[in-house]
C-alpha cells in the first residue's frame, strides 16, 4: 500500500531547509547505490560527511518520529539515516528496486520494509520529477506538495522521471517496520484510523475500548521487536 503523509514539515521548515541546502556540498548520487541502481541513477546527493548534513538529517528524523500518521502507517522499528537528493537538467533515476537490507550506524543492519520520500520542492517549481511506483495495484505517479511525505513498500519497482525544468529536492529514507507483512500492517492502519474516527465522533465507550483491545492484541501477535 502507498500512503500520503501530509505536513511532516511546515512551510517555514521547508523554506529553511531549502535555504540551507542551497549552501550544501552536492556529490554524485551513485555513491550510495549498488551496482544495479548505479546503471540507471543520475542525480546528486548532499555529502554525508558534512556538518550541515548531520544537522538536517536529525531534523528530518525528529519530524517523522513526531508525526502520528507516519507512526500509525509505518509502525517503525528502525529508521535509516535520511539522505537528500537533487534532480535538475534532465537528471533522472530509472526503474530499480531498493536493496532488501541496509547498514545502520546503531543496529548494524536493518531490513527495508518501507521507502519514504519527503518532498522539499513546490511541485509547480519544476516539470517532471514524478516518483513512479509499480505495485500489485498498478502504477502510481506521485508529486506532492513540499513538506509532504509518501510511504510505499520497498519491494516495489520505482523510478523518478527526468526533471526538464527547475529543481526537485527531496529527503528519502527506509523503514524497518515492527510489522513485516504489508497486508497485516495495512489492516492495523485501517483499524487504527477507524478507532480514532469513532473516538472523535462518540468519545470513549465500551465498543471503542473493545476495538482498542483488538488492535493492541493484533499488534502484540504480529510485531517483531
UniProtKB/Swiss-Prot annotation:
Q: Which InterPro entries match?
A: Oxoglu/Fe-dep_dioxygenase_dom, PKHD_C, PKHD_hydroxylase, Pro_4_hyd_alph, Pro_4_hyd_alph_FE2OG_OXY
Top-level taxon of the source organism: Bacteria
Q: Recorded GO terms, molecular function?
A: 2-oxoglutarate-dependent dioxygenase activity; iron ion binding; L-ascorbic acid binding
What are its cofactors? Fe(2+); L-ascorbate
Which residues take part in binding 2-oxoglutarate?
Answer: 168
What does the record say about how the cofactor binds? Answer: Binds 1 Fe(2+) ion per subunit.
Q: Known EC number(s)? A: 1.14.11.-
GO annotation (BP), single: intracellular iron ion homeostasis
Q: Which leading EC class covers this enzyme?
A: oxidoreductase
Residues covered by the Fe2OG dioxygenase domain: 78-177
- What keywords are annotated for this sequence in UniProt? Dioxygenase, Iron, Metal-binding, Oxidoreductase, Vitamin C
Residues bound to Fe cation: 96, 98, 158
Recorded hits in SMART domains, A to Z, give: P4Hc
Q: Which PANTHER family does the UniProt record give?
A: PKHD-TYPE HYDROXYLASE YBIX
Name by which UniProt lists this protein: PKHD-type hydroxylase YbiX
Supply the source organism for this entry.
Answer: Shigella boydii serotype 4 (strain Sb227)
Q: What is the lineage of its organism?
A: Bacteria, Pseudomonadati, Pseudomonadota, Gammaproteobacteria, Enterobacterales
- Gene responsible for this protein: ybiX
